[in-house]
C-alpha cells in the first residue's frame, strides 16, 4: 500500500473526516502525483523539491484555470499530507511549510518580448536542422507552444491524428473537452513534417503510436517533462524570469494583439470561453505602448 493510501486511510479511519473531505484530499493529492508523471506507489517524498510544488501551483492557475481559493485548498491538502509524513517518519524534509498561499488579485500575464523571442526561434531553428530526435522534438515543443498558443494539457494530450494531412491545421481538445481548430503556418508545418519523418524513420513511435510528443523510448511525455523542456530551452536562449509553456501561450497572445489581431480572433485561437479572459492581454499591450512612448516620444525624451 502506498504512502498516499496510508494517509487517506488515516484521515478516514482515525481522524474520522467526512467522506466529502476525504474525497477532496484524495483528489488534490492524486492530482499532484499524476502531474509528477508517477503512480502513487512510486511516490517518494524525498525526491520532491519545493520547485515541484511551485510549478504545480502555476500549472493549476495557468493551465487548469483554477481560482486562487481552489489552488489554496489543493496546497492545504498537500500541506496536511506532508505534515503527516513528517510526523510518521515518512520523510525528514519539510519543503512545503514556507509555501505561501496565492493572492486573490490577478497578475498581468508574463510574456517574452519580441526581440528575445526572435533569439529563441533562431536557436530552435538550429535544433530542428539536426537529425537528433530529442533535439528536434524539444524544438518542436517550443515552436508549438509559441505559434499555436496551446495550454500544457492540450499539447500533452495531442495525438498525431490531430494534425491535418496537409499540416495546415491542428485539432485541439481544450477545457471541458471543447474542440477547436487552430491554423498552422507554413514554416511550422514543415517543422512538424521533419519531426514526423524522424519519429517514423527511427521507429520512435512503436510503443505509443498515437501520441504527438514522444520520448526517445516511444512513450507520451509527461506534463512535467514538457515544462522542463520549455524552461531549459528558454533559459538557454537568454530568457530571464518565468519560463514555462504558459509564458509562451501568453507570448503568442500578446504578440498577436500587438500586431493588430482582433481580440475575438485571439479568444477563439486560445479557446477562451469568455472574452473577459482574453482582455487581460490588452493590459500588456498598453504597458508596451507606455514603454515605447517613454523612449520614443520627443516630448518625453526632453524631460
Residue spans for each PLM region:
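Conserved catalytic core of the tyrosine transesterase superfamily
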Residues: 1-303
Amino acid at each position: 500500500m502506498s504512502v498516499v493510501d496510508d494517509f487517506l486511510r488515516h484521515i478516514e479511519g482515525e481522524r474520522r473526516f467526512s467522506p466529502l473531505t476525504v474525497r477532496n484530499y484524495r483528489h488534490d493529492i492524486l492530482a499532484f502525483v499524476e502531474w509528477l508523471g508517477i503512480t502513487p506507489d512510486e511516490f517518494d517524498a524525498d525526491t520532491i523539491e519545493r520547485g515541484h510544488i511551485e510549478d504545480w501551483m502555476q500549472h493549476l492557475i495557468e493551465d487548469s484555470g483554477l481560482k486562487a481559493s481552489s489552488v489554496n485548498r489543493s496546497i492545504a491538502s498537500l500541506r496536511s499530507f506532508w505534515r503527516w509524513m513528517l510526523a510518521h517518519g515518512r520523510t525528514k524534509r519539510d519543503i512545503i511549510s514556507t509555501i505561501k498561499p496565492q493572492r486573490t488579485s490577478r497578475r498581468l500575464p508574463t510574456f517574452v518580448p519580441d526581440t528575445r523571442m526572435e533569439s529563441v526561434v533562431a536557436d530552435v531553428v538550429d535544433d530542428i536542422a539536426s537529425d537528433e530526435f530529442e533535439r528536434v522534438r524539444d524544438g518542436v515543443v517550443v515552436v508549438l507552444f509559441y505559434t499555436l498558443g496551446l495550454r500544457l494539457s492540450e499539447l500533452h494530450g495531442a495525438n498525431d491524428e490531430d494534425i491535418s494531412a496537409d499540416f495546415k491545421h491542428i485539432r485541439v481538445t481544450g477545457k471541458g473537452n471543447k474542440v477547436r481548430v487552430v491554423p498552422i503556418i507554413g514554416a511550422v508545418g514543415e517543422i512538424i513534417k521533419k519531426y514526423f519523418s524522424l519519429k517514423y524513420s527511427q521507429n520512435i513511435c512503436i510503443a505509443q503510436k498515437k501520441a504527438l510528443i514522444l520520448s526517445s523510448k516511444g512513450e507520451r511525455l509527461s506534463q512535467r517533462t514538457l515544462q522542463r523542456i520549455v524552461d531549459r530551452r528558454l533559459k538557454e536562449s537568454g530568457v530571464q524570469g518565468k519560463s514555462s509553456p504558459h509564458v509562451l501561450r501568453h507570448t503568442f497572445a500578446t504578440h498577436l494583439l500587438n500586431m493588430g489581431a482582433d481580440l475575438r480572433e485571439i479568444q477563439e485561437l486560445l479557446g477562451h470561453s469568455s472574452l473577459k479572459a482574453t482582455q487581460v492581454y490588452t493590459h500588456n499591450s498598453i504597458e508596451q505602448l507606455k514603454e515605447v512612448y517613454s523612449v520614443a516620444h520627443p516630448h518625453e525624451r526632453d524631460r
